[in-house]
């Protein structure tokens, strides 16, 4: 409570106190012993209009700055108990970052002045549309600071309330995990799937009005708040979900039009003149040549979902032949997961099977992990492998920003030596025609295409053991398995120490093991054990002899690598939280199996854009159709023309024709110069 006169002064309202009643043409408020006279300006009247509902005549002018009068006013508009909450708002509403933003826009920075300014905006009928993002900010990493301030503000509010209640033991405390908890509970938080580098970048470029202090209620998003506004041009792309989340989650453009590190947005008059692929399109739209100008907008939204979110790396894939350069920019725009970028100028000092070591000119060293890693696909319920490789050798120099290692299934330089380019799909010869082999959204593919578009899929099987359980048999990472094969066999602990001793002695006796009532962990697929991970809440010293040996063998292998690259060894005993919740004195073992998944009947492929096909038949090898022009070249798939027309994806036939022209032009030039090539397009 700052008092009425102070509030009027901060609102820059000229006022005076008079004992006699002012003329009717003046604005005034009557008190018990006088009148408060103020300028009858529209903004002043709107701000002070609420006082006419309050019985000011019961109070003298001397009482207008007192807390009792303020509490009585609160009682009229709600309840007196809200006073403590309003005090907290007064102290905490304007955080340092908000104050900086207000100064940038030349807005008031003090709580009372901000409320007065907000009231003055009601004077005119001018308004901004719900979807007009002018004046909004693009916030990224600063959200962590918001969570910190939120946690501190909540703690301070509780402390202030205890102080006002005269609690002598009042303390300002904060939960150790408060910031992490707020981040995890935020409506914009989600797991990062590692299917492709394209998905990684689009996940980073996803924006929403949801989140901390945002519009988090689904009923807030009516049609008028889901449409695309002209103020979004060169800031937000047209791509969005095409289901219930349409217009709620959006994608930023590649080169978003922002000002300053705080991400200020302005509605520029020349925005249309500045429109181009980088400024106007999302990365997925830029990787879909002709798509935004020739496809139905609804299909463009579907392209974003099918290409960015559902696309997966395959056995063989190629870059675009028709490109605007976005596919070459992509490896430099993502993190080091799929393409490792040098932080400074430097040189390669060591290359081993598991890692590469580099030394920068500043004297700093860096290590590139060349091992195969299992990463999560949070949307699909399976995992994938990511492995970086390098084309460099020991002693080779590089510049800051150069890509020194990359995932070869994601990138290649096939269409330009040294120009690393994103592999978006398999370049294949198809026929667009009316045929029973491809009716509506069904299609037929060749056996070679089915193999080229195969993927290595990883599935997980886990087992939770007590620390005294006895391991009878186990397989190791790298071992081949068949579906249903036992990978890990153990028996529950017994209380009798003599019985435990007997069990430990029988470990090497397979016949005896089979007769025991053991528990087995079997493989779900036929493939290879890719990795084994262990999470334990107990030290190995407390485990059974066989379980301790199993865990230590895996620990030692990991520690050998960490010592070689001079990285700290992680704590082996973990708290019983997260995935280990309610797992005291237990060991969680995760087995990851990789299997080779080729295309089969019922699988879906995307020809391009949002044009998908469900496989109804696979041509056997040697039975594929061929064209009369290139008799050595087999057709990889048949695409029904009705599917192209019905889905209004005009970019597909145009891009197909352009690809054909480029391929045949390349061959014609090679024919002129006598350069041999494979006319089967299989190399």
Region annotations inferred by a language model:
Residues 262, 268-683:
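Conserved structured catalytic cores and adjacent interaction surfaces
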Residues 1, 184-255, 320-344, 349, ...:
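Conserved mixed alpha/beta core segments that line enzyme active sites in large multi-domain catalysts
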Residues 132-135, 233, 415-417, 514:
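Short alpha-helical segments and helix-capping/turn motifs at coil-helix boundaries
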Residues 114-116, 228-230, 314, 423-425:
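Solvent-exposed alpha-helices and their adjacent loops that cap or buttress functional pockets
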Residues 42-44, 251-254, 369-376:
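A short, sequence-level motif marking secondary-structure junctions
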Residues 1-206, 242, 253-256, 260, ...:
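N-terminal non-catalytic structural scaffold regions of very large proteins
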């Amino acid at each position: 409570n700052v008092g009425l006169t102070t509030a009027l002064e901060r609102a820059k309202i000229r006022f005076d106190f008079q004992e006699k009643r002012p003329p009717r043409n003046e604005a005034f408020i009557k008190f018990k012993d006088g009148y408060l006279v103020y300028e009858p300006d529209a903004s002043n009247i709107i701000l002070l209009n609420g006082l006419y509902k309050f019985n000011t005549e019961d109070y003298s002018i001397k009482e207008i700055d007192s807390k009792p009068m303020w509490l009585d006013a609160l009682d009229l508009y709600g309840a007196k108990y809200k006073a403590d909450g309003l005090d907290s708002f007064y102290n905490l509403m304007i955080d340092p970052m908000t104050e900086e933003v207000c100064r940038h826009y030349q807005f008031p920075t003090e709580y009372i002045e901000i409320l007065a300014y907000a009231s003055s905006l009601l004077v005119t009928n001018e308004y901004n549309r719900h979807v007009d993002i002018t004046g909004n900010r693009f916030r990224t990493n600063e959200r962590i600071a918001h969570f910190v301030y939120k946690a501190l503000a909540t703690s301070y509010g509780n402390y202030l309330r205890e102080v006002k209640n005269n609690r002598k033991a009042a303390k300002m405390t904060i939960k150790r995990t408060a910031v992490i908890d707020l981040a995890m509970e935020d409506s914009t938080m989600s797991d990062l799937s590692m299917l492709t580098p394209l998905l990684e970048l689009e996940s980073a470029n996803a924006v929403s009005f949801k989140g901390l202090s945002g519009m988090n209620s689904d009923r807030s998003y009516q049609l008028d708040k889901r449409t695309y506004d002209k103020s979004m041009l060169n800031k937000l792309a047209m791509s969005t979900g095409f289901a219930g989340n349409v217009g709620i989650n959006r994608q930023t453009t590649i080169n978003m039009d922002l000002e300053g590190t705080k991400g200020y947005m302005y509605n520029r008059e020349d925005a249309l003149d500045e429109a181009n692929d980088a400024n106007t399109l999302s990365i997925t739209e830029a990787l879909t040549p002709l798509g935004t100008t020739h496809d139905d907008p609804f299909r463009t939204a579907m392209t974003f979902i099918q290409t960015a979110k559902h696309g997966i790396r395959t056995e063989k894939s190629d870059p675009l032949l028709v490109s605007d350069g976005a596919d070459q920019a992509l490896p430099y725009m993502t993190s080091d997961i799929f393409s490792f970028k040098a932080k400074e100028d430097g040189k390669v000092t060591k290359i081993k099977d598991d890692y590469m070591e580099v030394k920068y000119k500043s004297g700093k060293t860096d290590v590139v992990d060349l091992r195969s890693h299992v990463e999560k696909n949070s949307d699909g319920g399976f995992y994938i492998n990511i492995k970086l490789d390098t084309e460099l050798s020991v002693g080779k120099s590089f510049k800051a920003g150069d890509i020194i290692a990359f995932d070869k299934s994601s990138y290649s330089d096939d269409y330009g030596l040294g120009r690393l380019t994103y592999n978006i799909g398999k370049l294949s010869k198809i026929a667009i025609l009316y045929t029973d082999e491809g009716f509506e959204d069904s299609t037929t593919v060749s056996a070679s295409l089915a193999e080229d578009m195969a993927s290595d899929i990883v599935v997980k099987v886990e087992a939770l053991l007590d620390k005294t359980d006895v391991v009878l048999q186990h397989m190791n990472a790298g071992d081949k398995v068949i579906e249903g094969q036992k990978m890990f066999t153990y028996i529950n602990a017994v209380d009798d120490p003599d019985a435990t001793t007997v069990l430990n002695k029988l470990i090497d006796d397979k016949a005896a093991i089979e007769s025991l009532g053991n528990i087995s962990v079997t493989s779900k697929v036929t493939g290879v054990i890719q990795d084994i991970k262990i999470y334990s809440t107990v030290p190995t010293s407390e485990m059974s002899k066989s379980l301790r040996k199993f865990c230590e063998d895996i620990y030692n292998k990991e520690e050998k690598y960490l010592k070689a690259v001079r990285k700290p060894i992680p704590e082996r005993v973990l708290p019983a939280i997260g995935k280990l919740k309610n797992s005291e004195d237990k060991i969680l073992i995760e087995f990851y199996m990789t299997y080779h998944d080729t295309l089969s009947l019922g699988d879906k492929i995307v020809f391009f854009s949002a044009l998908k096909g469900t496989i109804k038949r696979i041509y056997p090898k040697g039975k594929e159709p061929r064209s009369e022009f290139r008799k050595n070249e087999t057709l990889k798939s048949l695409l029904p023309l009705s599917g192209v027309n019905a889905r209004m994806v005009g970019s597909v036939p145009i891009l197909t024709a352009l690809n054909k022209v480029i391929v045949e032009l390349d061959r014609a030039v090679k024919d002129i110069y006598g350069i041999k090539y494979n006319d089967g397009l299989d190399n």
